[in-house]
From Swiss-Prot:
Organism annotation: Photorhabdus laumondii subsp. laumondii (strain DSM 15139 / CIP 105565 / TT01) (Photorhabdus luminescens subsp. laumondii)
Database matches in InterPro entries: UPF0325
Protein name stated in the entry: UPF0325 protein plu0668
Family label: Belongs to the UPF0325 family.
Length: 128
């Protein structure tokens, strides 16, 4: 699992926190950030540079002939797919945690309102 990341020398893909991807000239720069250990100020990161692939394709108009385009490196595409699996899995866990906390806060609110309603009913009974 995560063969492309392991081929980059990343032995523990589960330690990946996030990644960024940017383009500089004819290269794509991938930066992978790992989870911080307790007491660390900065997360450890590694950077990889991938040259963009050049392709010659036919232009829209028959008059123009061919044009050259640059696109993302195929290997980088596979690495990003694996990174998305890791980072989205973490996001799903975070979203689930937020949902559970939201449900818990809502339940607290409902119970507090019900207790107040019952106490008000008791108060009415004791006044009579």
């Amino acid at each position: 699992m995560y063969d492309n990341l392991k081929s980059l020398g990343i032995t523990y893909p589960e330690e990946i926190d996030r990644y960024s991807l940017r383009q500089e000239a004819n290269n794509d720069i991938l930066k992978i950030y790992f989870r911080k250990d307790k007491g660390e100020f900065f997360a450890k990161s590694v950077k990889f540079k991938y040259p963009r692939q050049r392709k010659t394709v036919t232009a829209n108009n028959a008059e123009q002939g061919y044009k050259e385009i640059n696109e993302i490196n195929t290997n980088l595409r596979y690495v990003i797919e694996e990174l998305d699996q890791i980072c989205k899995r973490d996001q799903v866990e975070i979203d689930l945690k937020h949902k559970i906390l939201d449900d818990l806060r809502h339940l607290e609110h409902v119970v507090a309102n019900k207790i107040a309603e019952i106490e008000a009913d008791l108060e009415k009974l004791t006044r009579k």
